[in-house]
Amino acid sequence: MIGVLGVKTEVKLDIREKLSIIPKRYESSLMKLKEKCDEVVILSTCNRTEVYYSYKKHNENIISHIFKCLNWDENYKKYTFHYKDDEAINHLMRVICGFDSLILGEDQILSQIKQAYEIALSSKSVNRDLNKLFQMAITCGKEFRNKSQLYKIPVSSASIAVNEGRKHGGKNFMVLGYGAVGSLAVKYILSGEFDKLYIVVRNPSVVDLRDDRMTIINFNERGKYYKDVDCIISCTSAPHVVVDAFELPKHKNIVVYDLAVPRDVDEEVRYMKNVKLYDIDNISCINDENCSKREDIMNNNLFVIEKYEREFEKWRKTSEISPHIVNLKKKGDEVYKKRLTTFKNKKYTKDVDALAEIMLKSTSNAYINKAIEVLKEEQLKGRGEECLRIIEKIFYSAQ
């Protein structure tokens, strides 16, 4: 069975924080979950936390096991959803295509799911079912974007934050963190007008961009530069607050966008008269001008999702008989190798053509005689008609 346990997108941020998984705990969490499931993939972004799993043996306590492994309070179960098999598969396909998101059609989710899959792959927490499902989902996401051409009207929490920052008169930006979201925010800032950009990182070597208006500063020195900016975009993976209220200037207007979950910005910042603070929920509520256009385009391309759902279901059904196919091939090898040995031993002592005919006839009889034997047995059991239909399909239609 394949399933997914996730946090509902409409749940308030303070609850989502308690049900989040920070990146540095991914691998240890995967290992704990792997003890209860056959396969596991963790997807944790600023807008969603989801655990995809598979297992062969029935486990009615799977949700409790997941909560326990992740040290989540079971009183929060009501804030989660749980889908199985077809619903879980459909959910992943829709998510990777940008549906079921706080920001419809967001363009970060494909790379985020790909990264989640790669972490699970390197941690050896996926093998057959989830491996194939995520491979197909990633291909589905790429095809969906190509067919819908959503790249022409991109949207993400980073793009909204940068655009809104500019609307508030932002010219001097600071971006804290240079992961997937941070690097995207930097890209959007560099593509438009600005005076100064400060990129705050723990390891300056990760930023390989060059621009005279850009300054890379060490994380520990960030407080010195708050007075020089009018827009802060924070998107680190820290489990604690990184922007404290007491560090911000008291007499300078600043707009702050907190794109992190758990939140990067001290909640006290919200009460500062000279600072406007927007968290990820506030940003997700900003209905950008292209929202309805993206929705129409996406709905017109739902057939892509349906196509990959059918393909995965087809793969699942055929993969169930894979062990039998392997055994059939082994049996075929046994039949021909035994006769090949006989042919090699006798080809110089008998007429080669006659010997070849005998060997080929023997190979054919090995299967025909067994088919006749099974057909007779099934006829006596009242299943002769069904057996004959299969035999006809195998032998009579063979070329």
From Swiss-Prot:
Ligand binding (substrate): 45-48, 101, 106-108, 112
PROSITE patterns: GLUTR
Cysteine pairs bridged by disulfides in the record: none
Positions annotated to bind NADP(+): 177-182
InterPro entries, per the entry: 4pyrrol_synth_GluRdtase, 4pyrrol_synth_GluRdtase_dimer, 4pyrrol_synth_GluRdtase_N, GluRdtase_CS, GluRdtase_N_sf, NAD(P)-bd_dom_sf, Shikm_DH/Glu-tRNA_Rdtase
Record GO terms (molecular function): glutamyl-tRNA reductase activity; NADP binding
Description of how the protein assembles with itself and partners: Homodimer.
Entry-linked HAMAP family: Glu_tRNA_reductase
Protein name: Glutamyl-tRNA reductase
Species name: Clostridium tetani (strain Massachusetts / E88)
Gene: hemA
